Design a protein with these regions (language model features):
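N-terminal cofactor/phosphate-binding cores enriched in small/glycine residues
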Residues: 3-73, 81, 375
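Glycine-rich, anion-gripping cofactor-binding loops and their flanking helix/strand elements
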Residues: 60, 64, 75-76, 82, ...
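Active-site diphosphate/adenylate-binding microenvironment
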Residues: 9-13, 26-30, 34-35, 323-417
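Structural signature of the thiamine diphosphate
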Residues: 19-22, 64-76, 80-82, 89-101, ...
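Phosphate/pyrophosphate-binding active-site segments
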Residues: 1-4, 165, 267-270, 274-367, ...
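Structural motif
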Residues: 26-28, 75-76, 133-135, 151-154, ...
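Conformationally flexible catalytic loops at phosphate/diphosphate-handling active centers
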Residues: 6, 30, 41, 140-197
């Protein structure tokens, strides 16, 4: 006897309740048995979104904070394909996610039936499909991989004669961040010996963690990495590529050998070309530490832990401190130079100045995450997230919403939801404006501020090779891409609060005001210029 679609959907909901706490559900006909079964569960938090692409990124934002699988459920056809960008980012950033797609019965494949595509294997190398046609298939499902695709063939009838009974325990205790027992464990690559008497620099990127034994080693940390004890500004990298430089420190001038003998890479750094170029220096030994199956670059030795001996030399610590201070002062001087006007870097600095312990920060993957790095992040007590897996701007508004929902769920008894701030460029904001499309009956963020550094186009291209004067004739059309969108009207259309800042002082005042008196969702548009971004980038590299 063939299992009914309702029995299969109920079994799927049971499996999800054992492996996830949150489900993002999209409307559709073919997945209606799944919708009924999931909405009947009192031990699952269901969020409804009408756009599958945004839904998948909302799930990804939830998962980044929770550090466990979050499911996104949709109907058949291109609805499934719309989750591909989020699946790619999840794979590249090792973030758990589960796509649960409804499918047509196999007899309908290749017949031209509506909303029928080949969904099995749709995600290719990024995720293996687990196909379900029966209860027995459901019982064999596994969440052992970070990325899960459950493809469920559902036949008619798709609507039950009566609604299913409530299932699960509504009083289920909230689960804090951390992988459930069914989720995959970190990969252990063993230990690597490290002599810290050699001049050592740590470069910590996304997915980095506090490595025992490296606590007091000078570290260039990207904003999504833990805050190191000896934090070195990324602009110091220009000193580390040289064998010897003249440095002023503590009132004295001296020459010093500034090239590290070894670099330890923790996690997945990507942000700064000058920093990444150190990994290609043949005079520097590179050691890679990872808790996943991938390593950054081509390290000569790899592991997940260190057996550290010796201590960093005092002279090396002073060199790193001096180089880092030069980098930080370079940024301060540039911010104080009125010739650059009001730029995205100024916006990042203002946001950084208002961050407090317990805040959550989501950074756009283009200029904002780099500007935040120059502004001094990471900060202790501020959980920072950015899409650094594939490093695309896709779905950042949705991820910010998901992160805010996850954070406030951890503090259900607080009168005011914890503060979440998203710093985005205008193109990143516009690219995922559907992230603000939340139904009136759905859970909404309670304290999310989205700061949009709006320079009317692709500001990052101003700093890249395509922004050079010699090839600039068609720059605005192909790369600058001015849009002239009225952000205030967009915010109003999505029923969120809106403020505009034309100057740094106005932005600072708005950030203070919205921190003290937050709306559920607030968009602050900072009207910036990109006309000086190339000159600003050149100033920072001097």
């Amino acid at each position: 006897m063939t299992d009914s679609s309702f029995d299969i959907a109920t079994a799927i909901a049971d499996v999800l309740a054992r492996n996830v706490t949150d489900v993002v559900l999209c409307p559709g006909s073919r997945n209606s048995p799944l919708a009924y079964a999931l909405l009947a569960r009192e031990d699952l938090c269901v969020h409804v979104r009408i756009d599958e692409r945004s839904a998948a990124f909302t799930a990804l934002g939830l998962a980044r904070v929770q550090r466990r699988h979050v499911a996104v459920v949709m109907t058949s056809g291109t609805a499934v394909a719309n989750t591909m960008p989020a699946m790619v980012e999840a794979h590249m950033s090792h973030t758990p996610i589960a796509v649960v797609s409804a499918d047509r019965p196999s007899r309908m494949l290749g017949t031209g039936a509506s909303q029928t595509i080949w969904q099995q294997g749709l995600f290719g190398r990024y995720c293996t499909t687990q196909h379900v046609e029966s209860i027995a298939d459901v019982e064999a499902l596994s969440f052992a991989a970070d990325q899960v695709h459950i493809n469920v063939a559902l036949d008619t009838p798709l609507v039950p004669e009566e609604l299913p009974r409530r299932a699960g325990q509504a009083e289920r205790a909230p689960v804090g961040p951390g992988r459930l027992d069914t989720a995959p464990a970190w990969v252990d690559h063993g230990s690597v010996d490290v002599d810290l008497e050699r001049d050592t620099l740590v470069i910590a990127g996304d997915e980095a963690w506090d490595v025992p034994g490296l606590e007091y080693v000078p570290t260039i940390a990207e904003p999504t990495a833990p805050t190191p004890f000896h934090q070195v500004h990324p602009l110091a990298a220009r000193f580390f590529v040289q064998s010897e430089v003249a440095i002023s420190h503590d009132g004295g001038d001296f020459s010093a050998s500034t090239k590290p003998e070894q670099i330890i890479v923790v996690g997945h750094p990507t942000l700064h070309r000058e920093v990444m170029s150190l990994l290609e220096d043949p005079d520097i030994e590179v050691i890679g530490l990872s808790r996943t199956e991938t390593f950054t670059g081509h390290p000569t030795r790899t592991g997940s832990r260190v057996n550290a001996t010796g201590q960093p030399r005092d002279s090396w610590l002073k060199i790193c401190e001096a180089a880092g201070e030069v980098g930080a002062q370079t940024v301060r001087d540039a911010l104080a130079d009125a010739a650059f006007g009001f730029t995205g870097l100024h916006v990042a600095a203002a946001v950084a100045d208002t961050l407090g312990v317990g805040d959550t920060l989501v950074l756009g993957a283009s200029n904002p995450v780099r500007d935040a790095s120059y502004a001094g992040l990471p900060f202790d007590g501020v959980a920072t997230y950015s899409a650094r897996g594939a490093a695309g701007i896709d779905g950042t508004v949705s991820q910010a919403v998901g992160a805010a929902l996850a954070v406030q769920a951890l503090h259900p008894d607080e009168i005011r939801a914890p503060r979440t701030v998203a710093l985005l460029g205008d193109l990143t904001f516009l690219h995922d404006i559907n992230g603000l499309l939340i139904g009136p009956g759905e859970r909404r963020p309670g304290n999310l501020t989205i700061v949009v550094a709006n320079d009317d186009g692709g500001g990052i291209f101003e700093t890249l090779e395509v922004g050079a004067d010699s090839v600039r004739e068609d720059f605005e059309r192909a790369f600058g891409t001015p849009h002239g969108v009225d952000v205030e009207r967009l915010a109003g259309a999505h029923d969120v609060a809106y403020h505009r800042a034309e100057t740094l002082t106005e932005l600072q005042e708005l950030l203070v005001e919205t921190t003290a008196n937050p709306e559920p969702v607030t968009v602050i548009e900072a009207r910036t210029t990109r006309a000086t971004r190339r000159e600003l980038a050149q100033r920072l590299k001097k």
